[in-house]
């Protein structure tokens, strides 16, 4: 017996009843980014594997364990993008849009892919909205990105459910000094570390700081502190960021163990976290990557950005009951017509309504049917009102308007007054 066709594990369909919430969320973010002056960029979901090895780092978990990599017919190694920053940097380099210090404030949306163990809030195909800013190096732009996300949480009604965590990783030179001190300290206590941390000690020791192993965390209590190795430039930058967040009234906590999972970060790193989703608590994260463009072959170009996971934020909206009631309704009006002449008149009326009321969500019954069956479909559609057109209404050039939600009697409305009457009725519903 052949195996039934189904989606790949960890890669989910977004069904029609889920789509309105996704469109609401994506539209809210896109509208906000427009008001801040950010421009959208779209990059392919497939890139040369070398791009991610050079940007993310060859010895990271993402490159070593999680990427979907394959060889094409030309023998080139290609990878489904695991994150959006590297592709965005590649695009601005390839097209020269950051040359001569030109500022670029960009955003993107799309699918990312990582071969991880699927669980609630973590998937193998997932969606991100990300922002990247090039050629601005002050703490003011770092603050703008955080203020932008804070405003978004307000629009979504979730400010009380998220917390901002901040840290500074310093410059690459300061981080190298700290790395040496941390390795020396942990090497003397190697057997007390968990297996993952022992492996990371050689490849990516800073990642040990966010280990979930209790024994490792106990060892880290006495470890050197990153803030003690920060250079003056990074200290001034970090103080400037904190001062701006204080001025904007945005609460935050300093998390000295926040290092982020990608090698390219420097100076500012931040995460928005929630305790409402269990283990998958990070809903938005980002930071500064001033050396990445040069690392990928470009001229020295500063960069800062963030990415947010759409699935987790939608899950948070649902968990908190913050899904607007209006978006669960996909149709405002359902038109029922009985008889061939009424159907023809109904088509003309419906197109006239769409001309007069461009935002109207109007469904016209298709496939005929009795009054009872059409009215049942109208009610099931979730529409606020049914429009009823039969021989009697046709003779009088009227149409019946019947509320489907709540109280109210059917009214007969003249065709030429229908658009105005509908607009008022929907606004008051």
From Swiss-Prot:
One of the record's GO cellular component terms: cytoplasm
EC main group: ligase
Gene Ontology biological process terms, A to Z: histidyl-tRNA aminoacylation
UniProt xrefs under Pfam families: HGTP_anticodon, tRNA-synt_His
Subcellular location: Cytoplasm
Reaction catalysed by this enzyme: tRNA(His) + L-histidine + ATP = L-histidyl-tRNA(His) + AMP + diphosphate + H(+)
GO MF term set: ATP binding; histidine-tRNA ligase activity
Membrane-spanning ranges: none
InterPro entries noted in UniProt: aa-tRNA-synth_II, aa-tRNA-synth_II/BPL/LPL, Anticodon-bd, Anticodon-bd_dom_sf, His-tRNA-ligase, HisRS-like_core, HisRS/HisZ, HisRS_anticodon
Ranges in a coiled coil: none
Keyword Lyase: no
Keyword vocabulary terms for this entry: Aminoacyl-tRNA synthetase, ATP-binding, Cytoplasm, Ligase, Nucleotide-binding, Protein biosynthesis
Stored PROSITE patterns: AA_TRNA_LIGASE_II
EC number, as in UniProt: 6.1.1.21
Subunit structure: Homodimer.
Family from the record: Belongs to the class-II aminoacyl-tRNA synthetase family.
Name the UniProt record assigns to this protein: Histidine--tRNA ligase
